Amino acid sequence: MEESRESPAEHGYYMPAEWDSHAQTWIGWPERQDNWRHNALPAQRVFADVAKAISKFEPVTVCASPAQWENARKQLPEDIRVVEMSMNDSWFRDSGPTFIVRKRPVKLSSLNRNIAGIDWNFNAWGGANDGCYNDWSHDLLVSRKILALERIPRFQHSMILEGGSIHVDGEGTCLVTEECLLNKNRNPHMSKEQIEEELKKYLGVQSFIWLPRGLYGDEDTNGHIDNMCCFARPGVVLLSWTDDETDPQYERSVEALSVLSNSIDARGRKIQVIKLYIPEPLYMTEEESSGITQDGEAIPRLAGTRLAASYVNFYIANGGIIAPQFGDPIRDKEAIRVLSDTFPHHSVVGIENAREIVLAGGNIHCITQQQPAEPTSVAENGH
């Protein structure tokens, strides 16, 4: 596996949009008893449903720990690859690599692949005092292992960053939240300008849209963008929304809308906002909380906690949209309709019982990581 000391942008790489063609999707397999209830069995069924849904559109690789490999293999169809990999938890959007591509080799680049991966630093969303669990040593190696398996060049970065904290349009614009990226539990030594500079060098972006805050209740990640707002296509975003002025989310959504309405992207386009209504407020039940082993190794999951449920946390596959369903008949149906209208060339697949994932702090986008298709160089075609 090649490694490089120069920045990805110097080699011609950039992060493509999620709707660009994929080679495959990576997913981790849940097992932490202190985060997933009933020994993670209900969550495993939903993860399997997500993997199966995506596999109808593109190849899927599921990574499972040595103790869970056989169980994962049994629960998943044969066309889904299952590989053994240790992890502290199964949030591959955040512990997995950020894949980057280039259209053609750059003259002075020593790297011969048109795909590479960024291996960011990771501290379990906050480090020793604020993180979601005490030991993330296995998670730190996930990106490196995935890139080694695929023999893809690796760019390592000391900056702490999770994939769920960035969204790009593939045309130079990056969407982020101040709540997460400027949080003192991530990179306290870096200014906003320094963070932008590093993301320009590593993601190949030129401009940023900073939303002040993420989704209300998304305390685990300190307001990841992927639960709040995402690009649907260049110049168009989907924004988590509520009309209920008594819901603390209302203020956040209005604030974000104001920023977006006054923003232009890297190509000079005004941003069009499509509102994607959140479900009616969901809370962890006593029964759900009691099914989780609360042993002090991970943050407690308490009954009555507002769940960070949002339909923006969907995944774009090749020709498919894999979207969470929360058991709210009106909002679930409406989310499918809005996503179908927004992505007319994709089939929208709703995943029932996505609540099992949100009980542990994330959703479908958080558990998936796309590996883009490697662009074929013009030079390789002999033109």
Curated annotation (Swiss-Prot):
Pathway: Amine and polyamine biosynthesis; putrescine biosynthesis via agmatine pathway; N-carbamoylputrescine from agmatine: step 1/1. Inhibited by N-ethylmaleimide and iodoacetamide. The active site is at 366 (amidino-cysteine intermediate). Keywords: Hydrolase, Polyamine biosynthesis. It catalyses: agmatine + H2O = N-carbamoylputrescine + NH4(+). It is an enzyme of class 3 (hydrolase). Optimum pH is 7.0. This is Agmatine deiminase.
